[in-house]
Regions:
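Inter-lobe coupling/hinge segments of SF2-like helicase ATPases
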Residues: 1-17, 21-372, 376-384, 388, ...
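Short, charged, intrinsically disordered terminal tails
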Residues: 443-449
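Juxtacatalytic substrate-recognition/specificity segment
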Residues: 404
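Charge-rich, low-aromatic oligomerization/scaffolding segments with amphipathic character
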Residues: 420-421
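Structured alpha/beta or helical-core interaction and ligand-binding surfaces enriched in interleaved
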Residues: 390, 424-426, 434-441
Length: 449
């Protein structure tokens, strides 16, 4: 708090002329702001989704418009919205045709897991294991990427089938073996992993299902016991300080094999890294999200870009059950243009952003019946307009978070429709918010959970 107070004062007094910050930096009291650079503008983390909903990237553009100064949106994998704005002339486009220092792009290939399955109980295919071995022989570094924290996303009993679920959320508890805990990644609930099943009482029959980065690290050590292995994940003991030290160690070449989540995809420079293996390239494609293909393309492009940044010959290998998926084909061929053309055409056909407008309405309450009743009453109070219609209500994919039951409505409108006015009238004509009911409105939602 003291540091924030000092920065606030120094910016307001003009003592600080350049600020590098997160979303909240937009609200500092600049007197002579003349430029905003939004780095990695495609990153969904720019959208705040609790309490006050806003997209910092869009707020930066608005602030630049109000102050009549330039705003730079930079990304190697721009969002579809930004891409369309550049194509239509709303934004100027400056293309960077090559990597820094003219470094060659990595050679990319898909490993078809139907033809090259991992060994029983493992998650690394024979071609990927062989590629790691050859990289070690050359005394170069490998990165194994899996966007899943912890050891395993699900723990169950082999005897009765009991699954460990958060008592306050509709999500499975994730085993974190390094910490000996089961953790909810939605609300933060933690509990010690028991030795016996709480349902049937059977000892030593709890099994981990699926991999997280900790489990991949265990498999790597089994294959390469002499290699220096490091796990990079945001929730490891030691916090930000430990993470910074470990990133520095990787950059200095003090690790042979790195296993990491999406934080390793964010602009880090590892000079001796020449192999990137994506353990599960299909992970994001199954999400019920209109941006699922775009997000997967961006994430995989960014993480494979960690290889060969200093000019060394490098490779990126994507383990997938869908090698013919348009996202996989675009990444392997290096043809980003075809991906964007296809994605933009599909969005336009479906009337999805940026060719249409969306608003999410999330109704939550202490009881399921209360949340559902309010959501249905809200829907009955709204009549579809000519260019706007309402979908739902339906139970949210994450139907219980922090002890609150959740239902969602989705308002979809044409690009020039007055969506905010429609939602405002819908809330005014609907039932009054009483008891434990809470209603949140998310214009242009980035998450549909």
């Amino acid at each position: 708090p003291r540091l924030r107070e000092r920065v606030w004062r120094q910016v307001g007094e003009g003592q600080v002329r350049v600020v590098a910050g997160a979303r909240s930096a937009l609200f500092l009291p600049f007197n002579e702001l003349g430029l905003i650079v939004v780095d990695e503008e495609h990153d969904p983390a720019f959208k705040q989704e609790d309490r006050v909903f806003y997209n910092a990237r869009d707020m930066a553009v608005v602030r630049g418009h109000i102050g009549n100064f330039p705003v730079i949106l930079s990304s190697a994998t721009p969002s579809v919205e930004t891409r369309v704005n550049a194509q239509t002339g709303r934004y100027a486009r400056v293309a960077l045709p090559s990597r820094y220092a003219e470094a060659a792009l990595p050679e990319l290939a898909a490993i078809d897991l139907r033809r090259h399955p991992p060994a029983r109980g493992g998650f690394l295919s024979p071609p990927l294991i062989e590629a790691i071995r050859k990289t070690l022989e050359k005394e170069e570094q490998s990165l194994l990427f899996l966007n899943r924290r912890g050891y395993a996303p699900l723990t169950l009993c082999r005897v009765c089938g009991h699954r460990f679920q958060c008592p306050d959320c509709s999500s499975w508890l994730v085993e974190h073996r390094f910490r000996g805990q089961l953790v909810c990644h939605q609300c933060g609930h933690t509990e010690k992993k028991p030795e016996a099943c709480p349902e049937c009482g059977t000892l030593d029959h709890l099994v981990a299902c699926g991999p997280g980065v900790e489990r991949i690290a265990e498999e790597v050590v089994a294959h390469f016991p002499d290699a220096r292995t490091i796990v990079l994940s945001s929730d490891l003991v030691g916090g930000v300080r430990r993470l910074r030290l470990e990133l520095e160690a990787v950059a200095k070449g003090e690790a042979d094999i790195v296993i990491g989540t999406q934080l390793v995809a964010k602009g880090h420079n590892f000079p001796n890294m020449t192999l990137v293996g994506v353990v599960d390239a299909d992970l994001g494609l199954a999400l019920a999200d209109p941006r699922a293909a775009e997000r997967t393309f961006q994430l995989l492009s960014q993480v494979t870009g960690r290889a060969g940044r200093t000019g060394k010959k490098s490779r990126g290998l994507l383990q997938t059950y869908q090698p013919d998926h348009p996202v996989m084909r675009a990444i392997v061929s290096g043809d980003a243009e075809s991906f964007y053309e296809r994605e933009i055409a599909e969005r336009e056909r479906a009337g999805l952003p940026p060719f249409g407008r969306l608003a999410g309405i999330i109704v939550s309450a202490a009881s399921r019946a209360e949340a559902e009743s309010h959501a249905r009453s809200l829907r009955r109070a709204s009549a579809d307009a000519a260019a706007i219609h309402v979908l739902g209500p339906a139970e949210a994919p994450l139907s219980l978070v922090g002890g609150r039951h959740r239902f969602r409505l989705l308002v979809q409108g044409e690009r020039k429709s007055h969506l905010q006015g429609f939602v405002r009238k819908m809330l005014a004509d609907g039932p009054k918010v009483r008891g434990s009911v809470r209603v949140a409105v998310d214009i242009d939602p980035q998450s549909f959970l």
